[in-house]
Design a protein with these regions (language model features):
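Conserved beta-strand-loop-alpha-helix junction that forms the acyl-donor binding cleft
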Residues: 16, 70-85, 97-99
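Short beta-strand micro-motifs in enzyme catalytic cores
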Residues: 13, 35-37, 101-108
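Conserved catalytic-core motifs of GNAT/GCN5-like acyltransferases
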Residues: 90-105
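Conserved acetyl-CoA binding element of GNAT-fold acetyltransferases
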Residues: 32-46, 72
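A short helix-loop-beta-strand connector motif used in the catalytic cores of GNAT acetyltransferases and
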Residues: 3-20, 65-66
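Conserved acetyl-CoA-binding loop-helix of GNAT-fold acetyltransferases
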Residues: 47-62, 82, 86
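Short intrinsically disordered terminal tails
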Residues: 1, 115-122
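A conserved beta-strand-loop-helix scaffold within acyl/acetyltransferase catalytic domains
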Residues: 22-33
Length: 122
């Protein structure tokens, strides 16, 4: 299952505040109707307080979606990996082709998993 095989259906707002926007992109594979949910987060600023607020919003949102949620970085680096792991995402695929022609790692937050969050740095 690669993002390259799927077409965009809709964006669903997870939360938005003055420093962060988080949306869930719903994608569908035309050949069989399979759905893939991809999380997108844009941070205008970074701080431990903003991270805590994002985690609080995520904790309210995640139980409402009974499906796996995927994530991939625009630019893969250790900072992105650390950030996404704060929300329970784990590596799934080291290199998957994406719709824009780039190859990126895919991370997953499994549905109904015991959510484990790393402690927030102060």
């Amino acid at each position: 299952m690669s993002p390259e095989d799927f077409s965009h259906v809709a964006f669903h707002k997870v939360f938005e505040n003055e420093y962060a926007t988080c949306e869930l992109e719903e994608m569908r594979r035309p050949c069989d109707g399979a759905t893939m949910l991809i999380i997108h987060a844009d941070l205008a600023r970074w701080s431990p307080r903003i991270l805590r607020e994002c985690q609080k919003q995520w904790a309210l949102f995640r139980p409402t979606v009974p499906h796996n949620i995927f994530a991939y970085p625009l630019v893969p680096d250790a900072r992105w990996e650390k950030f996404i792991s704060y929300f329970g995402f784990v590596p799934l695929i080291a290199a998957a082709p994406c719709n824009d022609g780039e190859t990126r790692p895919i991370w997953i937050n499994y549905a109904r998993q015991q959510q484990h969050h790393e402690p927030i740095p102060e």
